[in-house]
Amino acid sequence: MSSTGFTSPFGNANPFGSSGRSESGPMHRLVEEDENDTITSPTTPHFGVKNNAAPAFWNGFGGDAPSDMPVRRQPDDFPAHYNLGRRTSVSAESLKPVTDNSDNWSPPVHPKTAEQLERLKKAISGNFLFNHLEDDQSAQVLGALVEKPVPAKGIKVITQGDAGDYFYVVEKGRFEVYVNSTGALQPGPDGMGQKVGEIAEGGSFGELALMYNAPRAATVVSAEPQCTLWALDRVTFRRILMESTFSRRRMYESFLEEVPILKTLTPYERSKIADALESQKYPAGHEIILEGDPGHSFFLLEAGEAAAFKRGNDSPVKNYKKGDFFGELALLNDAPRAASVISQTEVKVARLGKNAFQRLLGPIESILRRTRYVEAEEVDPLQVS
């Protein structure tokens, strides 16, 4: 195999040792792998450079050799007829979210200098996958990521059709994305297929294969030398993000139960809203919505305090606390925002987009209208939207 391939930490040896017994752990592994397969570990210093002396059309990073390649025997390999005639099966890691302390799993931590940590924070700051994470979960992601220099142009980082093992964030450089209509990398100079895009600094790739247990959907190749990637392994990726999604949904369901306007909804309807909400934080003094702007979102105040202001009026016309909502009238009436809402303290809001608002809050539209008009009569003529 060319030196561009990933080096397995076990080489060609039986990863369970001479006894042939697997060690217990939080995940199950596929043991019927081809002995020729080599998979990259993000803990290796860097991606290798292609050895032109060996065929490389399927030998990208994370790539698998064809299943009909001859098998090189090693003294400590499995017996020659191991599993011959037996049905093989594939089992994946168990990633069921847990609510107790019986799960001893903890994410790996790879030490980083202050400079590396700062660069990494910048690299993932704009990535949508991490926007909803709590501070402690973001810290887990930062700790688990491993720096992966890519020294040369034309190095395959992931290969279409392969199993996905790592998720990557681009800190430096550019990467080209190719898709072959056959669904996998093919032999020959045009085997990667058609170029469909590029990924630049701050971008990411490889998440789909990890999220959905699907083969890689594209081949990603370095477009210039001296690139830098950060790699997150499959289990850590799924555990942190899936646990985050599960915890976030439970938190929102509990929160929505406390919102008076939503008490008439069924638990199922509230759960659908919980799935659609996006959490955002704002510092004190931030304009969450601006008077006169078109309305695109509905907001629930999770924490902190905010106030509504009309132009020409220095005093707030309405104050908001945890559990209050605003921004609904612009969506109900398809009208511009009637007031500005400004955070008075650091706040955390749950945002619901216009389409989701109209789809999910239809059952209480009349209540939303009635409640707001009652409040407008009792408090002020503001129709905050």
UniProtKB/Swiss-Prot annotation:
Chain coiled-coil ranges: none
Residues with Phosphoserine modification: 89
Top-rank taxon: Eukaryota
The keyword NAD is assigned to this record: no
Cross-referenced PROSITE patterns: CNMP_BINDING_1, CNMP_BINDING_2, CNMP_BINDING_3
Region Dimerization and phosphorylation, annotated ranges: 1-128
InterPro entries: cAMP-dep_PK_reg_su-like, cAMP_dep_PK_reg_su, cNMP-bd_CS, cNMP-bd_dom, cNMP-bd_dom_sf, RmlC-like_jellyroll
GO molecular function, one term: protein kinase A catalytic subunit binding
GO cellular component, one term: nucleus
GO biological process, one term: adenylate cyclase-activating G protein-coupled receptor signaling pathway
Keyword Zinc applies: no
Biased composition (Polar residues): 1-22
Record region (Disordered): 1-51, 77-111
Gene3D superfamilies noted in UniProt: Jelly Rolls
Keywords linked to the UniProt accession: cAMP, cAMP-binding, Nucleotide-binding, Phosphoprotein, Repeat
Record-listed 3',5'-cyclic AMP 2 binding positions: 261-378
Annotated 3',5'-cyclic AMP 1 binding sites: 129-260
Pfam family, one: cNMP_binding
Subunit structure, interactors included: Tetramer, composed of 2 regulatory (R) and 2 catalytic (C) subunits. In the presence of cAMP it dissociates into 2 active monomeric C subunits and an R dimer.
Family the UniProt entry places it in: Belongs to the cAMP-dependent kinase regulatory chain family.
UniProt-recorded name of the protein: cAMP-dependent protein kinase regulatory subunit
